[in-house]
UniProtKB/Swiss-Prot annotation:
The keyword Ribonucleoprotein applies. Gene3D superfamilies: Ribosomal protein L14. One of its GO terms (cellular component) is cytosolic large ribosomal subunit. It comes from Enterococcus faecalis (strain ATCC 700802 / V583). Belongs to the universal ribosomal protein uL14 family. GO terms for molecular function: large ribosomal subunit rRNA binding; structural constituent of ribosome. Transmembrane segments: none annotated. Pfam families: Ribosomal_L14. GO terms for biological process: translation. Keywords: Ribonucleoprotein, Ribosomal protein, RNA-binding, rRNA-binding. This is Large ribosomal subunit protein uL14. Binds to 23S rRNA. Forms part of two intersubunit bridges in the 70S ribosome. InterPro entries: Ribosomal_uL14 (IPR000218), Ribosomal_uL14_bac-type (IPR005745), Ribosomal_uL14_CS (IPR019972), Ribosomal_uL14_sf (IPR036853). Part of the 50S ribosomal subunit. Forms a cluster with proteins L3 and L19. In the 70S ribosome, L14 and L19 interact and together make contacts with the 16S rRNA in bridges B5 and B8. The lineage of its organism: Bacteria, Bacillati, Bacillota, Bacilli, Lactobacillales.
Length: 122
């Protein structure tokens, strides 16, 4: 579960390496976010020459969490790290590549471009 001030690794080649959560979108007073939820974040670390610069405020979708997510069949999916992909307002990724596996829950939330770019969908 991701909340305000949580730091996440960026799983794309947009130029950002690490982001810090500012706000969880979707309802007033919402405290936590899980896989497939959109957050507003600021870039804390960035690579030189990238599309995204340090200090920039961006929207991102969570693709991996340590706490994991429960599925309809009763199984759980957990990952080794918390990671997100930086997106535009139309839910398309700002980068052109996705690194590492992503959860199947993204398909249910209509992030089709991220699912198609990902090397593995779990």
């Amino acid at each position: 579960m991701i909340q305000q001030e949580s730091r996440l690794r960026v799983a794309d080649n947009s130029g950002a390496r690490e982001i810090l959560t500012i706000k969880v979108l979707g309802g007033s007073g919402r405290k936590t976010a899980n896989i497939g939820d959109v957050i507003v974040a600021t870039v804390k670390q960035a690579t030189p020459g990238g599309v995204v610069k340090k200090g920039e405020v961006v929207k991102a979708v969570i693709v991996r969490t340590k706490s994991g997510a429960r599925r309809a069949d009763g199984s759980y999916i957990k990952f080794d790290e918390n990671a997100a992909v930086i997106i535009r307002d139309d839910k398309s990724p700002r980068g052109t590549r996705i690194f590492g596996p992503v959860a199947r829950e993204l398909r249910e939330n209509n992030f089709m471009k991220i699912v198609s770019l990902a090397p593995e969908v779990l």
